[in-house]
Amino acid sequence: MCRMVLAVGRVKDGETLVDTVKSLVNAASMDPYGKEFLNEEQHRDGWGALIIGIRDSSVAMLHHRSVKPIFEDNPVGIIGPFLKSLDDVVVMMVHARAASTGTPINIFSTHPVRAITNGGSELYMIHNGSFSKDLLLKAADVSEGVASRYNDTYIANLALARRIGNDVGRDDLTWLLNHVRTGANLGVALIGSDYVSFVAGSYYRLLNDGRDGARERYYRVYMCEVGDLTIYASSTVIDHYRPSQLAKDNCRIIANGEYHKYILHNNGDMEERQVWLLSR
């Protein structure tokens, strides 16, 4: 399983984003919720980031992936200068991975994974939870032999890309949730020719097995607002390592099955946030 932070909105400088990444590093290094729920206190199976900056109709992007543990690498040194250069519209997704048992640990399976949609757009995904990989193979048009090199998130993103053209709709996400095994805390970014479509949210299955309390503590996602910037973060990041810029009163837990969609245009315009309440 994994820890992640996401951001969307407008920034004057990247310091808040840098500090949020630092908190993610701490959460990946020592995760009390992971220890409680999965007996995993570290997320050491690679990390990655997608950062998109839009200013004056100019778009810049950084996509980085590494199989090193995020807390043994230098994420602030690698992506920090880019974050600090941002001065307007931004989308950020940063992910620290703890691979599920039996899943490959390689650069292909390190998030954010990438695919090309039917319409020629780029589709990126980060994910905490697991999909039923076998059920997605046909939709992804991938053989079992080839699929063995990739994790469930890669196959899920590829299957979603095969389904869509140049946007991610509510029905598309509902379809994807029908293939969830344990949970789908997600960040999805679709990069089109003149806009970015971004979705963030949380879903996890409750099993009534006496462990739903620990399950909720592990899977819950916070939404925090700082000026014109909205940050989404895994529970450990906020409950145990909350950055000083993220006031507790400005953070809330999003509902199980709640997803938010944003559309950001290359001219700097941002459309009003859409809220989707989905269930299986």
Q: Where do the language-model regions lie?
A:
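N-terminal segments that mediate ammonia production and transfer
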Residues: 1-280
